[in-house]
From Swiss-Prot:
The keyword Transferase applies. The gene is rpoC. This is DNA-directed RNA polymerase subunit beta'. Zn(2+) 1 binds at C70, C72, C85, C88. It catalyses: RNA(n) + a ribonucleoside 5'-triphosphate = RNA(n+1) + diphosphate. CDD domains: RNAP_beta'_C, RNAP_beta'_N. It holds the Pfam family RNA_pol_Rpb1_3. It is an enzyme of class 2 (transferase). The lineage of its organism: Bacteria, Pseudomonadati, Pseudomonadota, Gammaproteobacteria, Aeromonadales. Its EC number is 2.7.7.6. Mg(2+) binds at D460, D462, D464. One of its GO terms (biological process) is DNA-templated transcription. NCBIfam families: rpoC_TIGR. DNA-dependent RNA polymerase catalyzes the transcription of DNA into RNA using the four ribonucleoside triphosphates as substrates. It comes from Aeromonas salmonicida (strain A449). Zn(2+) 2 binds at C840, C915, C922, C925.
Length: 1434
């Protein structure tokens, strides 16, 4: 018996495998899978419910319907296993073979497989070099195709219509062979000589020069080579045998009432079998050709429908007019096999319930209702009951649990102790959406959740539900405890900031207890310590906010981690002293009570009057930001354990004092400022005045609208300012009898000020005025809502308000779907990005500098390099070789402080993009694991983490495109630069000339003006437009507030670089120019006509201004032999006359800039999606393809010809540019490769091609960050870099070298690199390539793994391509492994896979292990069965 069980166990053992290969099935292979031919369309007998013989459910072919029982009932039970019944022919075995055994149908005529025919590009068409239309005409019997031309003048695969065929027959008889239908295509495919074709095509490729021909040949060549390498034969794309799916995978279930529920596949198979049998009969009867042909066509159509219904023609529908679900539909889409059953499954041992607050829980606990726990832990309880001897059998244990006996609860307590459970809240947008807790049993039916983890789950208690899962195995429990416990997930993986941060009530409570109040009860007391402070407060002798002196003992952490005690008397408040009781040892008191920085005058006053110490108490209370910083500091200094305890204590304390504070919202808290009436009246008067101006025609409608909106916007600002001043400050007399100002104790103000709830904007709507509202299309309604919510709205105001509210709801719904889809694409592209090695040894990296926009540092260097590994030694500024930080060092907080102290302003750090690991990434290039704070571990799935970090805040982003108009566009037209910092000027990429006033005039496009401080750090940077006049010199010192540059924002000047006399060319009045006189000033100016406006005589002319000297000779531009001449584009205005003298740096002409109207700026989610999809912008910036000198060639109707002549004498580059594009360059100007020639949004593809990998990475990272920064979301750059690395996975082959690659084909970079290393080692020529940027969808679909790609999108296309190419899936990524049902090669699975591979390698080395041959195994099995057949088992 034991042997038998052993044998049964052995049966289920799976094979070890490393990769999965997909290919075409040959007819013989299909027959070898099959257990018999299905000959009849019958399914089951409607009376006996037994399957019909030879039918679709036949037991003889597919196996018995009942376990170990043949159909007629002659053989039953295990002892007859393997016997084949002589009456009904059914093998006695388990029913589950009906899920595995396949059948087949012998087709009477071959049929084409629709996937290889219709899936674009058509594989059959590509191989035969015929168009899809022609092939379809042959297949569906509309025309003949020549198969063997013989000695005739026909050609192989030539199409012949019916008449042509008959004519040819008359002329040549049976000299030639032509057929129609799939037989014809089959014969053509059989006739292909793959090797010969490949050879001729490679020769063709070497000879041809035409691009289209190359492309076509390359495609065909790749397909042919794929066939050759994979061992597939082209004729297998035409089927002569059709496999039949095992019946249990297409079940037929009898419903009550004698009807059946059936899978659509059965209908489709029945159709095929019926037509096939009819065709066989017709062929036997030798029916007329036309009937046979029709039947063959119908057979082809029914096979098409079975494989992929609806791919060709109309889909076959069932009885209910719904298209039938074919085999292809079974695997694709959200409901298909991949996404429904393989990537996500429902699991056992889980339950869900509503959540409520558990304010008394510790951070690692959750409250689990007893009822749920009993159900979830049932098997454990049964086991315990049995092992204790309290129940004899499982049945008895079950009864006890059902009766809920007292002993059961005790056992449940034991079972649950230290057994973590997982809590999950949908939608799980990032990994913190599932965390582990230790359950504590509670009464009631709701799960209790710790308030601090709500932020990570994005949960609230308005009816949210959560699911509980029980990790069963020891390993699972271990992982839950070590990796997923809520106490181990204090930092957010997206930004490395704490995510366990108190919010709402807790913040309010802590804020309230750390506030100081003037003249509170007990002001001026001196207390012995925090304990006494608490006693005094509890006894009611002092108020929580009283300013007192307290003796505080701090423990300061030294460099060697030892603690030093320091006690001193501090000026503080009672509340802060009480709060210091929960500070972990090693954190200084200043973290919760920052000492006030006194001015010199205040210090002198304090020295003179010591009793004034009350005023030196800091008036800063703990807000949300400070609390977050407090926790962060605690984590970095004290470590995990202290932080967890501290966070819990903060929460309890916060709740306690929030309750005591009694902060509430009353209508009287919304104080309306007295100034509101006057401000509104003044605004209304201004609006009336503008209306009068409009009616008298002084301003246009547009100007009136914009001005009105400006007026109301500023009125709103003034009202809200008055309101906030009113709310936020109050004056009071202190114990010394002096009046002092303090922050208000108004409840509404406190809630907003602490960061607990609400914001200034919301208070403004309550107590100020609601302000301007937008229409649904985004334009602003010019009459604002002057009322606020306290005063109440009238009907019209209420109606206007509904627009915004409704649009908000609609947006949210859209946003959620779009954001989810973006996350899905990101996960899919990055899923195989895992840390696979410790160090790849590269010296490459990205240069990091602080991000500066205008005068503001948006992101300091410290935040950008923290947690990165240095790629190059950081040299101390001002020295030649003093190394601050050596390369390959991880920059932690201390080292970043060091860099800041030494004012380093650029660091080269390693990055995922420059990592040289072939598959995955190395730990050093990634840097710190943000959620843990140390160097990332091997096996960390950084790709998925990156995708989640970018996708999770997606729902917070807006969906809208911003219309910049009205109030906002004022800022756009800047005309000067005022510096905000004191320092020295530095110009970068500047070209300039000195004008007559000896000021610098900028003559280059990409000039940046930066302000450096005395340490050489960049403080701010500004872009200078062409033609701006500088008030300062390079290197000059400036102080904050100085204006350093001016320009005219509305026109674009053309600046002279030399002095001379003007000479006009081709400037003929009425032909190329016209004169206009200004009505106000009476001055006349010359305006150049646009090409379209000129008479035909002037079309070819190019109006030019030349500079000549006194003798009329051309003046040269200094340093070149190019004459100084300036071509004038259309619409240019010239204010000087012919022959006028000009100096250096003067403007000879001005080009009016169209005020760029209300441009739509794509913002929010769509912008992020565009960047990651690497979409080409509508009108991208035009970049210089090579470095050289600009000139303009012959113009065509709507375009200008731009010519760049390289300085080093290479080939000239020409490009046609539409006339309406505003060019930034003039004739004779020198440009560098990649410089912007015409403004517009830059295309990432151009940046990569012309500037390289590093700039494109920076561009995408900065653009994505801009969107998130606007919403206040912090994401580390690393995550974006990981995604960009995946977008740069592919390259285009420029020259193949000695590899077997084809020029112009797109291949994974890793594959080329591996091949090249091999070639270089052998001394051969490696291939050269250039990187290409792919959007995330395209990158996901073109990954090496076909399983991963097929489960993402376009399943049919991916699988078709993979099958034809005979692709192997190496199962490297996470998705593939989930689908084949293995541990993923990341995290703990990384180690498992390594161990597996090593074990196998060791087994392979230990040769000489006796291997059992198949025959021996069979013999052993037979012996076993005979042995076990001797006894019968009940």
């Amino acid at each position: 018996m034991k042997d038998l069980l052993k044998f049964l166990k052995a049966q289920t053992k799976t094979e070890e495998f490393d990769s999965i290969k997909i290919g075409l099935a040959s007819p013989d292979m299909i027959r070898s899978w099959s257990f018999g031919e299905v000959k009849k369309p019958e399914t089951i007998n409607y009376r006996t419910f037994k399957p019909e013989r030879d039918g679709l459910f036949c037991a003889r072919i597919f196996g018995p319907v009942k376990d170990y029982e043949c159909l007629c009932g002659k053989y039953k039970r295990l002892k007859h296993r393997g016997v084949i019944c002589e009456k009904c022919g059914v093998e006695v075995t388990q029913t589950k073979v009906r899920r595995e055994r396949m059948g087949h149908i012998e087709l009477a005529s071959p049929t084409a497989h629709i996937w290889f025919l219709k899936s674009l590009p058509s594989r059959i068409g590509l191989l035969l070099d015929m168009t899809l239309r022609d092939i379809e005409r042959v297949l569906y019997f509309e025309s003949y195709v020549v198969i063997e031309p013989g000695m005739t003048n026909l050609e192989r695969s030539q199409m012949l219509s019916e008449e042509n065929y008959l004519d040819a027959l008359e002329e040549w008889g049976d000299e030639f062979d032509a057929k129609m239908g799939a037989e014809a295509i089959l014969a053509l495919l059989r006739a292909i000589d793959l090797e010969g074709e490949v050879k001729t095509m490679r020769e063709e490729l070497d000879q041809t020069n035409s691009e289209t021909k190359r492309k076509k040949t390359t495609k065909r060549l790749k397909l042919m080579e794929a066939f050759l390498q994979s061992g597939n034969k082209p004729e297998w794309m035409i089927m002569t045998v059709l496999p039949v799916l095992p019946p249990d995978l297409r079940p037929l279930v009898p419903l009550d009432g004698g009807r059946f529920a059936t899978s659509d596949l059965n209908d489709l198979y029945r159709r095929v079998i019926n037509r096939n049998n009819r065709l066989k009969r017709l062929l036997d009867l030798a029916a007329p050709d036309i009937i046979v042909r029709n039947e063959k066509r119908m057979l082809q159509e029914s096979v098409d429908a079975l494989l992929d219904n609806g791919r060709r023609g109309r889909a076959i529908t069932g009885s209910n007019k719904r298209p039938l679900k074919s085999l292809a539909d079974m695997i694709k889409g959200k409901q298909g096999r991949f996404r429904q059953n393989l990537l996500g499954k429902r699991v056992d041992y889980s339950g869900r319930s509503v959540i409520t607050v558990g304010p008394t829980l510790r951070l690692h606990q959750c409250g689990l209702p007893k009822k749920m726990a009993l159900e979830l832990f049932k098997p454990f309880i049964y086991g315990k009951l049995e092992s204790r001897g309290l129940a004899t059998t499982i049945k008895a244990a079950k009864k006890m649990v059902e009766r809920e006996e007292a002993v059961v609860w005790d056992i449940l307590d034991e079972v649950i102790r230290e057994h973590p459970v997982l809590l999950n809240r949908a939608p799980t947008l990032h990994r913190l959406g599932i965390q582990a807790f230790e359950p504590t049993l509670i009464e009631g039916k709701a799960i209790q959740l710790h308030p601090l983890v709500c932020a990570a789950y994005n949960a609230d208690f308005d009816g949210d539900q959560m699911a509980v899962h029980v990790p069963l195995t020891l390993e699972a429990q271990l992982e839950a405890r070590a990796l997923m416990m809520s106490t181990n997930n204090i930092l957010s993986p997206a930004s490395g900031e704490p995510i366990i941060v108190p919010s709402q009530d807790v913040v309010l409570g802590l804020y309230y207890m750390t506030r100081a109040r003037i003249n509170a009860k007990g002001e001026g007391m001196v207390l012995a310590g925090p304990k006494e402070a608490e006693k005094v407060y509890r006894a009611g002798l002092a108020d929580l906010h009283a300013r007192v002196k307290v003796r505080i003992t701090e423990y300061l952490r030294q460099a060697d981690d030892s603690l030093v005690e320091r006690t001193e008397l501090k000026n503080t408040t009672v509340g802060r002293a009480i709060l210091s009781l929960i500070l972990p040892k090693g954190m200084e008191y200043a973290l919760i009570d920052e000492p006030k920085v006194l001015t010199a005058a205040e210090q002198a006053d304090l020295d003179a009057n010591p009793q004034n110490w009350i005023k030196s108490v800091s008036n800063k209370a703990l807000g949300k930001k400070l609390i977050s910083r407090l926790l962060n500091t605690c984590y970095r200094k004290q470590g995990l354990k202290d932080t967890v305890i501290f966070a819990d204590q903060l929460m309890y304390t916060g709740f306690h004092y929030a309750a005591l504070s009694g902060a509430s919202v009353g209508i009287d808290d919304m104080v309306i400022p007295d100034a509101k009436k006057d401000i509104i009246a003044a605004a209304e008067a201004e609006v009336a005045e503008i209306q009068d101006q409009f009616l008298s025609g002084l301003v246009t409608a547009g100007e009136r609208y914009n001005k009105v909106i400006d007026i109301w916007a500023s009125a709103n600002e003034r009202v809200s300012k008055a309101m906030m001043e009113n709310l936020s400050k109050e004056r009071d007399v202190n114990s010394l009898g002096e009046e002092e100002e303090q922050a208000s104790f108004n409840s509404i103000f406190m809630m907003a000020d602490s960061g607990a709830r609400g914001s200034a904007a919301q208070i403004r709507q309550l107590a100020g005025m609601r302000g301007l509202m937008a229409k649904p299309d985004g334009s602003i309604i010019e009459t604002p809502i002057v009322a606020n919510f306290r005063e109440g709205l009238n009907v019209l105001q209420y109606f206007i308000s509904t627009h915004g509210a409704r649009k908000g709801l609609a947006d949210t719904a859209l946003k959620t779907a779009n954001s989810g889809y973006l996350t899905r694409r990101l996960v899919d592209v990055a899923q195989d990005m895992v840390i696979t090695e410790d160090d790849c040894g590269t010296v490459e990296g990205l240069w990091m500098t602080p991000l500066i926009e205008g005068g503001d540092v948006v992101e300091p260097l410290r935040e950008r390099v923290l947690g990165r590994v240095v790629a190059d030694d950081v040299i101390k500024p001002g020295t030649e070789d003093e190394i601050l930080v050596a390369r390959n060092t991880l920059l932690d907080e201390q080292l970043c402080d060091l860099l800041e102290r030494n004012s380093v302003d650029r660091v080269k750090v390693r990055s995922a993009i420059t990592c040289e690991t072939d598959f995955g990434n190395c730990a050093h290039c990634y840097g710190r694991d943000l959620a843990r704070g140390h160097l990332v571990n091997k096996g960390e799935a950084v790709g998925v983490i990156a995708a989640q970090s970018i996708g999770e805040p997606g729902t917070q982003l807006t969906m809208r495109t911003f219309h910049i108009g009205g109030a906002a566009s004022r800022a756009a037209a800047e005309s000067s630069i005022q510096v905000k910092n004191t320092g020295s000027i530095k110009l970068q990429n500047a070209k300039f000339v000195h004008n007559s006033d000896d000021k610098l005039v900028i003559t280059s496009r990409s000039t940046e003006l930066t302000i450096m401080d005395d340490m050489g750090r960049t403080k701010e940077s500004h872009k200078l437009p062409y033609g701006s006049v500088l008030e300062v010199k390079d290197g000059q010192a400036v102080s904050a507030g100085d204006t350093v540059a001016n320009w005219d924002p509305h026109t674009h000047p053309i600046i002279t670089e030399v002095a001379g006399r003007l000479q006009f060319e081709h400037m003929i009045d009425g032909v190329t120019i016209t004169r206009q006189t200004d009505e106000l000033t009476g001055l006349s100016s010359i305006v150049v006509l646009d090409v379209n406006e000129r008479p035909s005589a002037g079309k070819e002319m190019r109006p030019t201004v030349k500079l000549v000297d006194q003798n009329g000779k051309d003046v040269m531009i200094p340093g070149t032999d190019v004459a100084a001449q300036y071509f004038l584009p259309g619409k240019a205005i010239v204010n000087l006359e012919d022959g006028a003298n000009v100096g250096v740096g003067d403007a000879v002409a001005r080009i009016p800039q169209e005020s760029s109207g209300t441009k739509d700026i794509t913002g929010g989610l769509p912008r992020v999606a565009d960047l990651f999809e690497a979409r080409q912008p509508k009108e991208p910036a035009i970049l210089a393809e090579i470095s050289g000198t600009i000139s303009f060639g012959k113009e065509t109707k709507g375009k200008r010809r731009l010519v760049i002549t390289p300085t080093d004498g290479g080939d000239v580059y020409e490009e046609m540019i539409p006339k309406w594009r505003n060019l930034n360059v003039f004739e004779g100007e020198k440009v560098e490769k990649g410089e912007v020639l015409a403004d517009g949004p830059e295309s990432a593809h151009d940046i990569l091609r012309l500037r390289g990998i590093s700039p494109v990475a920076n561009y995408i990272a900065n653009e994505v960050q801009d969107v998130y920064r606007l919403q206040g979301v912090k994401i580390n750059d690393k995550h974006i870099e990981v995604i960009v690395r995946q977008m740069l996975r592919k390259c285009e082959i420029l020259s193949a070298g000695d590899t077997d690659l084809i020029e112009g084909e797109q291949v994974e970079v890793a594959r080329v690199k591996i091949a090249n290393r091999k070639l270089v080692a052998e001394g051969k020529t490696p291939a050269t390539f250039r990187h290409i940027l792919m959007g995330i969808t395209k990158a996901s679909l073109s990954t090496e793994s076909f399983i991963s790609a097929a489960s993402f999108q376009e399943t049919t296309r991916v699988l078709t391509e993979a099958a034809v190419g005979g692709k192997r899936d190496e199962l490297r990524g996470l998705k593939e492994n989930v689908i084949v049902g293995r541990l993923i090669p990341a995290g703990t699975g990384f180690a498992y896979h390594h161990a597996r591979i090593n074990q196998r390698a060791a087994a392979a080395r230990a040769v000489g292990v006796p291997q059992v041959t198949a025959d021996e195994a069979q013999q052993n099995l037979a012996d076993l069965l005979n042995a076990s057949g001797s006894f019968d088992e009940e």
